[in-house]
Structure formats: C-alpha cells, structure tokens
Amino acid sequence: MNNLIKSKLELLPTSPGCYIHKDKNGTIIYVGKAKNLRNRVRSYFRGSHDTKTEALVSEIVDFEFIVTESNIEALLLEINLIKENKPKYNIMLKDDKSYPFIKITNERYPRLIITRQVKKDGGLYFGPYPDVGAANEIKRLLDRIFPFRKCTNPPSKVCFYYHIGQCMAHTICKKDEAYFKSMAQEVSDFLKGQDNKIIDELKGKMAAAAQTMEFERAAEYRDLIQAIGTLRTKQRVMAKDLQNRDVFGYYVDKGWMCVQVFFVRQGKLIERDVNLFPYFNDPDEDFLTYVGQFYQEKSHLVPNEVLIPQDIDEEAVKALVDSKILKPQRGEKKQLVNLAIKNARVSLEQKFNLLEKSVEKTQGAIENLGRLLQIPTPVRIESFDNSNIMGTSPVSAMVVFVNGKPSKKDYRKYKIKTVVGPDDYASMREVIRRRYGRVQREALTPPDLIVIDGGQGQVHIAKQVIQEELGLDIPIAGLQKNDKHQTHELLFGDPLEVVELSRNSQEFFLLQRIQDEVHRFAITFHRQLRSKNSFSSQLDGIEGLGPKRKQNLMKHFKSLTKIKEASVDDIVEVGVPRAVAEAVQRKLNPQEAEALLQVAEERVDYQTEGNHNEP
C-alpha cells in the first residue's frame, strides 16, 4: 500500500457509494459499491485474502469514490460504470450470446420472422428460444398454418408461397388490417400453449378433405396435428399458471459464483442461462450487479415476473427490472427457485471437479516423466528453440513450465550476438551460456529439466556448456520433430538414446505442449524483429527522423504498410515536422513521388513556354 492510498483511506466517508480501483497506468481495473465506503474500501488493504483478491489488490495504486444517496443508487451507478469502463476484474456478461425470438412485424401486411434483436417497434415478440433450430422448427409449423406475408417487399405478382397456401398474396388480397390482427392474436394464443382451437379446426378440415376424397390434403392436416403434438411433448410444463417468468438462482464456493436463469414461458422451461465468475464483494451484492447487467446487456424481453432467492434485496431488484419481483416462500414458484439454485451448485461443482482432474493429469504427467527419465519430478522445466531465416535476425527463446503449466512471467527472448550466418549449434551454445551463466552468477533457481527443441547436435552443445563449462548438474533432454514438423522422439541419457514414450500418454502431451509453445514464442519474436529491422532500414537516412520519432511512428501506425498508406497530414499528427513527413512519404513511395515531380516539372515547362511567347 503506497502513501497516496494511505492518505485517501483516512478521507473515506461512511456513506453509501461506488469506489473505483486503478492500476499504475491509471486504468480502471475494478468498480464496486458499498453501503459503507470506509469499511469496504479499507477491507481490501487489511488482513489476508484469497488468491484472486490478492491479484486485484497487488495492481491497485490509486482509487476514487463517488458518494450516493442510497445503496440502490450506488447499485445503478456501479452497473453504468462497469458498462462504460469494462474493468478487467468485474463481472462482464458476454454480448455475443443473444437468443432468437419469433416476431410478428408491425406492418400493414405483417410478416413472421426470426430475430435476435428486441426493439420497441410495435412488433409482437415470442421467446426466447434455445437456438435458431428450435425457433425455425416452430416458425415452419406456423407458416403452414397461418398465411403471413413472406416477401420483404410485396411483389407485383403472386409468389410461390401463395400457390402452396402459405401466403395471402397481398397484391390481390382484400383483407383489412383487422383480419391480420386477428391472425396475429391466433399465433399469440398458439405460442402461449392455447392450441386446442387450432387443433380442432385442423381436425375438421382433415375430415372434410377425407369426405371429398382429397386424401393428400387430409394427410397434410394430419401431419400438422402430429407436429403440434410433438412440439407439446418437447416443452416441459414447470408451472400450472402458464406465466412468463425468469427464475434466478445462485451458488457460491471457493470465491466463485454461479448464476442460473431459467426462462419459463407459458409455464414451460424453454432455456436456461449459466454464468460462472469470481466475486470480490458480498455475494448478494455481486448477484444484484449481475441481475442489473443481465437485463441491461442481454437482448430479451423482460417477463411478467422475476423470481429471486430469499436473501436478495427485493427493492434493489425492483430498481433494476421493470417487472413484478417475487421472493416465493412456498409452493410451485419456490420449487422453481430451488431448482435454479440446485443447478447453479451442480455447475460450480462440475467446474471444480474438472479443474481437479486437470491438475491431477498435469501432476501425473510430470511425475511420470520424472520416473521415465529416472530423475526427481521436474517441477520446473525450461525449454529452448532457435529461429532465423538464412541467418538473418537470428534469435532464441526460452519458455518455462512450472507444475506442468506455462509460467509466462519467466519467459525470455534472446537476440543472437556472437554468431554470423545460419549456425544453429553456435546460437544454442551462446544462449545456453548466457542463460545459465546468469543463473550461476545471480544464484537463481535452476530448472529440474532442460528441454532442447532439436536433435543430438543441439543437446550435445547444451551438455558441453552446462556440465563442462559451468559445472552444473541439470538433466538435459532433446525433442526431435518428424518430417511433418510434429513432436516425434524424446532423447535422453549419456549416451543419448531414444526414450520409449506412448503417444497417448499425458507426459507425451505435456512435452508436445512445451515444444509447440517454445516454437511459437521463438517464431513470434523472430517475426517482430524482422518487421522492426525492415521498418528501420527503410526509414534510415531520412534527415530529422531519429530513433524516437521512428518509435512513435511504429507505435501509432503499427506497420510499415500503414505508414506508406498514410497522408503527410496523418504523419504530422504523430509529432513529425511536415518537411520530415514529406521526406518519409518520398522514401516509402518513390514511384508516387517521381510522378508528382514529373507533373511539377511539366507545369514549370508549360509556364516557361508561355513566358517565351509573350511579346
């Protein structure tokens, strides 16, 4: 905790409000609310916390606060601040998950469409449905029963759907708007489960068609009746009152929260929404934040009722959702909330079980690898790979895996300094010497295993440096790739031998991940260096363009191509003098500069000729 934070903590009021944590760059990393700002904000800097809260606190270098009149006002402000600033430690609902709806458009001749956008446009919306497939299935059924307009713009002639009885052909139809409103009401009744009237009508039409020997038409009506029956069986009735409601339940454990929302429409459970995330405050308050974001961000209709658990502030939810808010005490609605809570608990337990299995697999992989190589369990593994193209911009990279997982803070990049040309062995010698010479000098923690991305030659070089030059005792293994550039063989021992390794084993998958990661890291560094060198070389020799201005150009435009495409004014905006900006454009676009020069010369010649003709 720095002196600025200590001073500000003394100034905190006991009022409700929002607090805003910032990192060293002034970026907002967390927004929270509190009934008592002094108690809540001070709690971050006192006592011990779990790992995720420690990670948050370690990044806080400043905070601000906003006092509000009430806790509900603080809740609304918090939701807006999160939406505006998108802090990395706050709950952020995914915007890409929107559910499909069936819509009857508000047009003179209405259409039946599927949409993911719910707008206040006078249209009738039904849903949400679990996926587009389910919505399409129902829409196809409705199209066969109700002849709504199919075309976006009514055609001048009757369309194909008119001939198969699925369109009224509005170009020749004499029906008034009241007729279509009536048909829309029938669709609404049907989607609410009130389909007995339609089934009776279809049965009557089927019987009439059979009496007149129109058996194909009768079969069509029969299929429609069966399709409605199938649709009924797919939707489980959860409530007898056939209300539209959202049912919320949540469960917390080990610093994580799971919220489940059941979408119950016309008494039937049609879909659920599941979200798992870490929480930093009181779970009830973080749940309220979630509900506020849910109805602010998610594209779906607010239902007639919202059911919430007992321990949630009902008035706070009412401020967030324009709907009837209930905390059921008993009966069918209470069972729905309990079911949502139970499912939230199951989802959270599944997450922890999967994490435990992942840890077990990773731990088992490094233990098996140790047994296979007859060395202590390699908790820390360091791996190296070189990268160059025909000896240009040679680099090397080191990745570190601790307990079988990447430790990216320990990754290192190396520019090759002493090697000229494409000499992979010499490059490996330099990098191993630099890395473990430093480990020796600074008494750093050595790895339990070194993995070289290469064959016998590279491994021998590494052994010479580690064992003979530096006198260190660190096991060294090599990973060879096959012709398809895939992990193929593990080399180990003295002399080096191929270690038999099952390709389906966890230890093989671990080594494969290590090899892929060090290759990716080395290649990425090499590309960055090549790009930077290319950038520098093409901008060398421009008077007034020093290293700092080159760096600013690259930071702003990201690539040489973007600078080539930029105008002189664009370059000037980065802080480059106009004369220098013009020189940059001439250097990067010589053909264009030559053409402009030629035009200028022709203009001068023309003016000169004109002067000669004067009397």
UniProtKB/Swiss-Prot annotation:
GO terms for biological process: nucleotide-excision repair; SOS response. InterPro entries: GIY-YIG_endonuc, GIY-YIG_endonuc_sf, GIY-YIG_UvrC_Cho, RuvA_2-like, UVR_dom, UVR_dom_sf, UvrABC_protein_C, UvrC. One of its GO terms (cellular component) is excinuclease repair complex. Keywords: Cytoplasm, DNA damage, DNA excision, DNA repair, Excision nuclease, SOS response. Residues 196-231 form the UVR domain. It comes from the Bacteria. Residues 14-91 form the GIY-YIG domain. It is found in: Cytoplasm. SMART domains: GIYc. Transmembrane segments: none annotated. Belongs to the UvrC family. NCBIfam families: uvrC. Interacts with UvrB in an incision complex. The UvrABC repair system catalyzes the recognition and processing of DNA lesions. UvrC both incises the 5' and 3' sides of the lesion. The N-terminal half is responsible for the 3' incision and the C-terminal half is responsible for the 5' incision. This is UvrABC system protein C. The gene is uvrC.
